[in-house]
Design a protein with these regions (language model features):
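Short loop->beta-strand "edge-of-pocket" segments that line small-molecule binding or catalytic clefts
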Residues: 50-56, 151-164
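Periplasmic-binding protein-like
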Residues: 135-142, 207-250, 268-272
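Extended ligand-binding regions for polar small-molecule ligands
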Residues: 22, 77-78, 82-86, 165, ...
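Extracytoplasmic small-molecule ligand-binding "clamshell" domains
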Residues: 33-114
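A ligand-binding cleft/hinge motif common to bilobed small-molecule-binding domains
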Residues: 117-124, 170-173, 197-227
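Acidic, polar ligand-binding/catalytic clefts
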Residues: 81, 85, 90-153
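Short helix-initiation/N-cap motifs at beta->coil->alpha
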Residues: 93-103, 146, 163-166, 179-193, ...
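C-terminal motif of bacterial Sec signal peptides marking the signal peptidase cleavage site
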Residues: 17-20
Length: 272
């Protein structure tokens, strides 16, 4: 009996010792892990590697597209390149479809997204944004002579939209059915071919398209009352990185670099 008691006490001692060890090894995770660690890791990673990896479409003029030489360019591309330069690192772009952009950011394929990403409450629940660098409005685009002349006319009509965009939500809010597309260019193709009735998109994008293609058989027939703002997109827990990016954006606005880039692409300041 005495041997049994001693054995039991020894076993209890071992269990308590193991529990204490487990508690000690878990403690650092609760104090050093989580979002603070992620924040520090992203900024440190970018600085150590000397590269800021940026997700973008590359098919969305004038924000991100390929020019006649095949070079990736556009307003968002130049803004992101300037931000990277002011952080002392190189900008590296990874192109992907819009609807895969957020999954790519989640999977850490890139450090941020530069693709005129609109700020909305739903996205803010899952992601973090830099300070805004674009202010724009949604417009309704239809073939010339269409019976659709206002957003209210979208009830029961087919609208070509990127499925996860703010503009898809706008079209649905007016009763439109949605035809999913991979970007603005495909939406315009479907509109020109008569396969859809309309598309809702950014006024800056549509105006640029009409400037490049004045013969296009489409027109803007309505414009949303409220303006939307867009910003650079990050994973949750990127606080220090975003602070540095915001400093760079503020410096660009202060020294006139932002306005120079904006005037180049739009002929005006698109933040005001």
């Amino acid at each position: 009996m005495k041997k049994f008691t001693l054995g039991l006490l020894a076993l209890i001692g071992v269990v308590l010792l193991l529990a204490a060890c487990g508690s000690n090894t878990a403690a650092p995770d609760s104090t050093n892990g989580g979002s603070d660690s992620a924040e520090e890791d992203l900024l440190a990673k970018v600085q150590e590697e000397g590269t800021l990896t940026i997700g973008t479409e590359g098919t969305y003029p004038p924000f991100t597209f390929h020019d006649e030489t095949g070079k990736l360019t556009g307003f968002d591309v130049e803004i992101a390149e300037e931000v990277a330069s002011r952080l002392g690192v190189e900008a590296e772009f990874l192109e992907t479809q819009w609807d895969a952009m957020f999954a790519g950011l989640d999977a850490e394929r890139f450090d941020m997204v530069a693709n005129q990403v609109g700020i909305n409450p739903e996205r803010q629940e899952s992601y973090e944004f830099s300070d805004p660098y674009i202010t724009s409005t949604a417009v309704l685009v239809v073939p010339k002579d269409s019976e659709i002349q206002a957003f209210e006319d979208l009830e029961g009509k087919l609208s070509a939209q990127s499925l996860t965009s703010n503009y898809a939500e706008t079209a649905k809010s007016f009763g439109a059915e949605i035809e999913g597309v991979e970007g603005f260019n495909q939406a315009i193709e479907l509109l020109n071919s008569g396969r859809v009735d309309a598309t809702v998109n950014d006024n800056l994008t549509v105006l640029d398209f009409l400037k490049q293609r004045p013969e296009a058989n489409i027109e803007i027939v309505d414009e949303a009352d409220d303006a939307a703002q867009s910003a650079l997109l990050f994973r949750k827990g990127s606080g220090p990185m975003i602070e540095e990016v915001n400093k760079a954006l503020a410096e660009m606005i202060e020294d006139g670099t932002y306005e120079e880039i904006s005037n180049k692409w739009f002929g005006e300041n698109v933040l005001e």
